[in-house]
Amino acid sequence: MFPMKDHSALEQHTLSRDELRRRKGYKKGLQLSILLLGEKGSGKSTFLNNLCGQDISLSDGDYDDDDDKVTNNVTPENGNAIEDIDPGYKTAHLSPGLKLVTRRVYLNDELGVPITLDIILFPGCGDNVDNSQSSVVIKNYLDQQFANVLKEEVRIKRNTKETDGRPHVCLYFLKSTPRGVKKFDIELMKTICDKVNLIPIIPKADGLTETELNLHKDIVRQEISQNNIRVFDFKSDTLGETLALYDMDIDSSSAKSKYDNDTKIKEISPFAIVCSKTFNKNSENRVEHIRTYEWGSLVVEDQNTSDFIYLKAILLGSHLQELKDVTNNVLYENYRAKVLTEKKNNYDIPNYSYIDETSRGSVSNVSTRRNSASRTLGNPDTNDENAYQIHKEIDEKNRIIEDYQRKIDLLEKMLAAPHQNKV
């Protein structure tokens, strides 16, 4: 008798590196950082509650996208916080300013894999009379997250526990208007599209007829193409592949069905979604969010009435790792190459000014500035001992980087050279 083969060991040996990494990631849990942009009233907070299946408490004195109440915001007129002002005509003349709100949410998806969602919002984005500085602040925030990672990489003693604050995807909520996409939204998307994976969203799609919705999607696609806005590339991925992870299929035989399993994801973008604060559990004990009208009701998770379920499957399932890989291997590497190239004529990695959660100053007063150490290093002849030590440490780091670069260049030459030793 021949000994029985250990098929589990054989399977482990033949698994691809990506598959092994995926299985290991499932055991440790997954993490995704989501940036949500769009003007007030576009339904961002309700979308997050539907996506996470829970109330993530964005309205506890900081932010409520679906509420008219203004709390703890900053006005350009006086730079002071406004506390609990009643909605209506009393606040109609006030600009809300711009601030940063972050939340961390822990959830288990349908596959039973623990997922950590880091949520980033900029309340006031697009809501001010003068929005000219909003794009600068948001761009600087994204650049600063890249800079933080780069600073950690060039440290001699690296802090492996340093939090990575880079957003992996930006969901941009574009409210439908008769004139198409607003100029501010176009300019902001152009500004940030090379710093974060951009996915355009059409919220509150139930307010449009099917003809109006298709027209608005065409307008958004046209504006994105004409303005060379880079959006996340789904390549030839299909909706059927996306839903397969959720053990779901597209019922193309249904009269209501708009798509089939072979429909490419990029063909339905921008995603038209409907969300609701009302929910219940269906016969399979799954949470369903219900939107009620005079003529009936609509299930948010129904694939025939909204693109929400496809977007959820993309973010929490099929494309979660790809969004992170593109962020790290493409967007960050482009930033890193640019900064290190410029660094030959500079002493330090730049700092970028943006409004953090503790800053309540007016956006119009924000300007890019370097920190005190950078200003000191700008004068090589300074007698300041601290500046000398910092200067010396940076020179040491530069030498290490140059040594690594020489080794890389040497390896590339060796790989490119013909194998002359072969007979």
Curated annotation (Swiss-Prot):
Residues 360-381 have a biased composition (Polar residues). GTP binds at residues 38-45, 124, 204-212, 291. GO terms for cellular component: ascospore wall; cell division site; cellular bud neck; cytosol; meiotic spindle; microtubule cytoskeleton; prospore membrane; septin complex. It is a peripheral membrane protein. GO terms for biological process: actomyosin contractile ring assembly; ascospore formation; cellular bud neck septin ring organization; cytoskeleton-dependent cytokinesis; division septum assembly; protein localization to bud neck. Keywords: Cell cycle, Cell division, Coiled coil, GTP-binding, Membrane, Nucleotide-binding. Residues 360-385 are annotated as: Disordered. Septins are GTPases involved in cytokinesis that assemble into filaments and form a ring at the cleavage site. May act by recruiting MYO1 and HOF1, a protein involved in septation, to the site of cleavage. Septins are also involved in cell morphogenesis, bud site selection, chitin deposition, cell cycle regulation, cell compartmentalization and spore wall formation. This is Sporulation-regulated protein 28. It comes from Saccharomyces cerevisiae (strain ATCC 204508 / S288c).
